[in-house]
């Protein structure tokens, strides 16, 4: 039986921080901060460890519901430590299949908050899962993201189909990559190449043709062709 959460959002957040502080390694935290260019603080907990701690918290205290879920996640995301930010996403992911369609607004909020590839790429995956549940959201939301000028929303709009394989809306993917083809932003060039590389495993002919016929950055082309070159396709 799932545990009913009886903690307030603030109490839950305090439990998360207390446990993560207790289990953190300051020396490891220094290395983590260096790797992420000192943009975020860290408790010094590796992914398998904080995931295990998250499971402990979920098992003991349950997961908040309704507005309390988002309020708790938001408090964790406001914390300076990246592991607390990760916990927020993990908690929402655990129950996202029970959430309404407007959860997309919360995902958008997180994408543009403390934005970096680690959280944005994870959130893009969750966005894709959400769009599979609510397909009518896909085009209007991602069109708005592409028009926003925010590189992280644009990256998410390009990456949300990463694991869709035969379910990929090819026209949408190619259209969005064309729109940012002249961008000098590394994370857009790299993201576009990554999306093309993944889709090349499903339809190499379509990807090869697109790369041939589209003026893409050298980085995007190189990344997009990587799997096909390796496989000799």
Residue ranges of each PLM-predicted region?
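Alpha-helical scaffold domains
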Residues: 2-233
